[in-house]
Amino acid sequence: MAANKGKSQGSLVLHKVIMVGSGGVGKSALTLQFMYDEFVEDYEPTKADSYRKKVVLDGEEVQIDILDTAGQEDYAAIRDNYFRSGEGFLLVFSITEHESFTATAEFREQILRVKSEEDKIPLLVVGNKSDLEERRQVPVDEARGKAEEWGVQYVETSAKTRANVDKVFFDLMREIRAKKMSENKDKNGRKSSKSKKSFKERCCLL
């Protein structure tokens, strides 16, 4: 009998991550660095590119699905559809461009509006291009303060040097996993209380 080589891809837990942020902040560079261990400096923006990879998250084999959305205003109208499909979001700006940091508030509002029925949306604020410290326009304290105000984690990354690239994707997957577990627990709790109620009603009828 052949040894079981682990779960098939179809049966693996899938975590859906959406890359969000202004154009040119390095969303694609972060994605490609995480996926293929390579730094791509010039990348033509498209509506969205989708990537899927099998990874080991805290000892469990899972799949991550990454949707890399374009930051340009031209694509703002179709962004809502992408946001609906996401389970967690990396909200990316460039530490060398304060305008891209300011824009994160608007992107966050859009996410909250689209996911308004959900309680806590897994989201990390990511300050990319940390290798360009001499060109920094966004102080660490300012970015961290905004993230704290929103109740989320702030991490600085460099797609070029790969600093914290794995961290942001894995930390976000952990948040997504925790949310799914909490939701499943709630569902099971509701089912359990319904079955208890149903049992009591049947007992009363006897």
Swiss-Prot record:
GO CC, one annotated term: plasma membrane
Family annotation (CDD domains): RalA_RalB
Motif, Effector region: chain positions: 43-51
Binding site for GTP: 21-29, 68-72, 128-131, 158-160
E.C. no: 3.6.5.2
A GO term, aspect molecular function: GDP binding
Chain positions with Cysteine methyl ester modification: C203
Lineage: Eukaryota, Metazoa, Chordata, Craniata, Vertebrata
UniProt-listed GO biological process terms: apoptotic process; cell division; cellular response to exogenous dsRNA; cellular response to starvation; positive regulation of autophagosome assembly; positive regulation of epidermal growth factor receptor signaling pathway; receptor internalization; regulation of exocyst assembly
Keyword vocabulary terms for this entry: Apoptosis, Cell cycle, Cell division, Cell membrane, GTP-binding, Hydrolase, Lipoprotein, Membrane, Methylation, Nucleotide-binding, Prenylation
SUPFAM superfamilies, sorted: P-loop containing nucleoside triphosphate hydrolases (SSF52540)
Protein name, entry field: Ras-related protein Ral-B
Subunit structure: Interacts with EXOC2/Sec5 and EXOC8/Exo84. Interacts (via effector domain) with RALBP1.
Main location, first listed in the record: membrane
Propeptide residue intervals: 204-206
Family under the similarity heading: Belongs to the small GTPase superfamily. Ras family.
Biological source species: Mus musculus
Recorded topology in the membrane: Lipid-anchor
InterPro entries, per the entry: P-loop_NTPase (IPR027417), Small_GTP-bd (IPR005225), Small_GTPase (IPR001806), Small_GTPase_Ras-type (IPR020849)
PANTHER family recorded: RAS, DI-RAS, AND RHEB FAMILY MEMBERS OF SMALL GTPASE SUPERFAMILY
